[in-house]
Amino acid sequence: MTELDSLWEAIQNSFRQDTTPVTFDTLIAPAKAISLSQNQLEIEVPTPVHRDFWRKNLNTQLKEFAQRELGRNIEPHYVLEGEFTYTNKKTEDDPTPSFEMDTPLNPHYNFGTFVVGEGNKMAHAAAFAVAESPGSLYNPLFIYGGVGLGKTHLMEAIGNHMLQVNPNSRVKYVTSEDFTNDYINAIRNNTTEQLREEYRNLDLLLIDDIQFLANKEGTQLEFFNTFNALHDRKKQIVMTSDRIPNEIPELQDRLVSRFRWGLTVEITPPDLETRIAILRSKVEEDHIDIGNDTLNYIAGQIDTNIRELEGALTKVQAFANLSGERITPSLASQALKGLHRVAKNEISIATIQKQVADFYNITQGDILGKKRVKQIVMPRQIAMYLSRELTDSSLPKIGNEFGGKDHTTVLHAIDKIETELKKDTDLQNDITKLKAKLRS
């Protein structure tokens, strides 16, 4: 086996263990190693989407892995199938071929610019599978989660990918409010047949914030018939919502039933590693000079959603520009100070105790009590940790709120959770979800 074959086999095996089967099969396995020189690994990928995904999500891991395996620095170089980099002078920085769009999709919302993490990897894999084979795998695809977590990005990425593969595809992106207005205007102008012609002959319908169809009986009926017409013709439907179908109030049972025909996937708030990766991607894209220590600090302060995370980065940039100072963790702390004082004051220790108890299916009395069973001790320690993180309370104050416990008990709980967070991804996700609930 050659050095190239050995390296590539090891790389593929490593990525296979670290990603979901769908992500590996659709985005990683199709790539091929073409050549290996002293300091460059040339990798062939089938589409620009694959190329962008490797660059954004796998590049750093690949270089670190190659360094360990070969003992030298290797720079990955990505080429499209049939693209000969040295004879036709194309480079990996060539722009993605343009395509015509007759639908208002944001071209920035593509799979290459989507940062994959623990909280969104299933949704990302499902979205890419749908984009590769619309109408056949998961139809409909229903993506749900909180505000600012990337649902619209993934939805529009499906549309952009489909138009890139086939510019003649009939793709339509609308919010549920747009659909409602189209329906009302069609009734008012006696153009319902034109409306149905427009919507029921699509190849892909993307409808955002479907929960706002609640309480609109006429619109729900029209969408029900549109859904059936598209699904019967094996045309893809993708929807987003802030909750699962059966939790949308006043949504007709027949719609709930049809929304469940395909696949429902959740996007949760990004964990710390994903937040750092999102910030790093943003500063690289915007050519901003910010050190990793500062990015790590910002990512540690904002754990609600991506919009607030990028907003915090913008605030730090503005603070630096106005003050004329270099961006450092200290400056970032000053820039974000007011933001977190407001957030902390809105959350009480009692609220934290109740949310943690509900999350782990125990009682608030268990949190305040003295039982030492693991199922109660860990949630109690988490509640103490969050009380320190999300309020301005002192250790003695927190101890008093937890049934009169000593401040050293609180300190031990905080240290315990901080230690576990460094190695326990399940705990990281639990903490992220709890913080999101408490701040929502």
Curated annotation (Swiss-Prot):
ATP binds at residues 148, 150-152. Residues 321-440 are annotated as: Domain IV, binds dsDNA. Keywords: ATP-binding, Cytoplasm, DNA replication, DNA-binding, Lipid-binding, Nucleotide-binding. GO terms for cellular component: cytoplasm; plasma membrane. It comes from the Bacteria. Residues 1-72 are annotated as: Domain I, interacts with DnaA modulators. SMART domains: AAA, Bac_DnaA_C. Its main location: cytoplasm. Residues 72-103 are annotated as: Domain II. The keyword Phosphoprotein does not apply. It is found in: Cytoplasm. GO terms for biological process: DNA replication initiation; regulation of DNA replication. Domain I is involved in oligomerization and binding regulators, domain II is flexibile and of varying length in different bacteria, domain III forms the AAA+ region, while domain IV binds dsDNA. PANTHER family: CHROMOSOMAL REPLICATION INITIATOR PROTEIN DNAA. HAMAP family: DnaA_bact. NCBIfam families: DnaA (TIGR00362). Plays an essential role in the initiation and regulation of chromosomal replication. ATP-DnaA binds to the origin of replication (oriC) to initiate formation of the DNA replication initiation complex once per cell cycle. Binds the DnaA box (a 9 base pair repeat at the origin) and separates the double-stranded (ds)DNA. Forms a right-handed helical filament on oriC DNA; dsDNA binds to the exterior of the filament while single-stranded (ss)DNA is stabiized in the filament's interior. This is Chromosomal replication initiator protein DnaA.
